[in-house]
Amino acid sequence: VTCDLLSIKGVAEHSACAANCLSMGKAGGRCENGICLCRKTTFKELWDKRF
């Protein structure tokens, strides 16, 4: 839904998708063909890997 609603905005759609994925505990995401795809990696896993 995030990608479809903001598809006219371009970059904004990816930011909204990433924010939506972050809110679900994932480490971001991107829009692809109007569908928001979240990363499989969780934010905690990414954080632990970096620090």
Curated annotation (Swiss-Prot):
Its main location: secreted. GO terms for cellular component: extracellular region. Coiled coil: none annotated. Induction: By bacterial infection. Disulfide bonds join 3-31, 17-36, 21-38. InterPro entries: Defensin_insect, Defensin_invertebrate/fungal, Scorpion_toxin-like_sf. PROSITE patterns: INVERT_DEFENSINS. The modification Phenylalanine amide is found at residue 51. SUPFAM superfamilies: Scorpion toxin-like. GO terms for biological process: defense response to bacterium; defense response to fungus; innate immune response; killing of cells of another organism. CDD domains: DEFL_defensin-like. Antibacterial peptide against Gram-positive and Gram-negative bacteria and fungi. This is Defensin.
